Curated annotation (Swiss-Prot):
HAMAP family: GlcN6P_deamin. It comes from Giardia intestinalis. One of its GO terms (molecular function) is identical protein binding. One of its GO terms (cellular component) is cytoplasm. The active site is at residues 82, 151, 153, 158. Its EC number is 3.5.99.6. Homohexamer. PROSITE patterns: GLC_GALNAC_ISOMERASE (PS01161). It catalyses: alpha-D-glucosamine 6-phosphate + H2O = beta-D-fructose 6-phosphate + NH4(+). InterPro entries: Glc/Gal-6P_isomerase, Glucosamine6P_isomerase, Glucosamine6P_isomerase_CS, NagB/RpiA_transferase-like. This is Glucosamine-6-phosphate deaminase 2. Keywords: Carbohydrate metabolism, Hydrolase. The keyword Hydrolase applies. One of its GO terms (biological process) is carbohydrate metabolic process.
Length: 263
């Protein structure tokens, strides 16, 4: 596992860093440019994509690269990590809506090449099986972009999720509901309590994993994921076992990691 810490006005740490940059947004740009490299080298690549506020700058940069430099998405296939149970794709907090708004409507990706979990599936368990089978048939993902939750979750794999988990229906923890309430007008009662999510084993099959974390609020989770022992109590820590996983974190999110490694 490699750690890329975006630092401001300080010497390089002893981390296995590939880049030292000054602005938080630069961590997102590094991720976007790595994804662009994969798209250029393998036009029909399979991308796993995340949602939430953290990857928005990544998608903005990918859209710019398409618009200004001709980055071609016409053969790219994509899978999203998860979806809220009960939300239609037209809901402004559904992850399909998010992807259309922030990336898919801005590049030349083909609708038949994008894959989502349906939050409205009558038989959610069957929908999860369908999605996992599609991933196994079309994938594995060449790159999977991840974020990290305050409690160390990846996708909606909450603490305690089995290492061998596959796409399934999950119950969200109260801490995740609390954290996501900001997207629902700060009304916790409007946040779905269940979701459909790819599993840890599914993510680990990706050829490459890029985890992006920014801001002080993610510092504790990042530290546990990178410095602590791999444990399903902190799902992101299990990524340490992946041969090609890179954490891209800004100075705020990576502060304790840098201090731990350089002591």
């Amino acid at each position: 596992m490699t750690v890329c810490v975006a630092q401001a006005e300080r010497g390089a740490s002893e981390l296995e860093s590939k880049a030292m940059v000054k602005k938080s947004n630069d961590a997102a740009l590094l991720v976007a440019h790595r994804i662009a490299e994969v798209v250029r080298s393998k036009p029909n690549c399979v991308l796993g994509l995340a949602t939430g506020s953290t990857p928005i700058p990544v998608y903005q940069e990918l859209a710019r690269l398409h618009r200004e430099e001709g980055l071609d998405f016409s053969q790219v296939r994509t899978f999203n990590l998860d979806e809220y149970a009960g939300l239609p794709p037209t809901h402004d907090q559904s992850y399909r809506f998010f992807m259309e708004e922030h990336l898919f409507s801005k590049v030349n990706i083909k609708p038949e090449n994008v894959h989502f979990l349906s939050g409205l599936a009558i038989r959610a368990e069957d929908e999860c099986i369908r999605y996992e089978n599609a991933l196994q048939t079309i994938g594995p993902c060449d790159v999977w972009l991840l974020g990290i939750g305050h409690n160390g979750h990846i996708a909606f794999n909450e603490p305690g999720s089995p290492r061998d988990s596959r796409t399934r229906v999950v119950c969200l923890t109260q801490s995740t509901i609390d954290a996501n309430a900001r997207f629902f007008g700060n009304d916790k009662s409007k946040v779905p309590t269940k979701a459909l999510s790819v599993g840890i084993a599914t993510i680990m099959e990706s050829r490459e994993i890029l985890l992006l974390a920014t801001g002080e609020s993610k510092c504790e989770a990042v530290t546990k994921a990178i410095v602590g022992e791999p444990t399903n109590a902190v799902p992101a820590s299990l990524l340490q076992r992946h041969p090609r996983c890179c954490f891209y974190v800004d100075e705020a999110a990576g502060a304790e990691v840098a201090e731990t490694v350089t002591e």
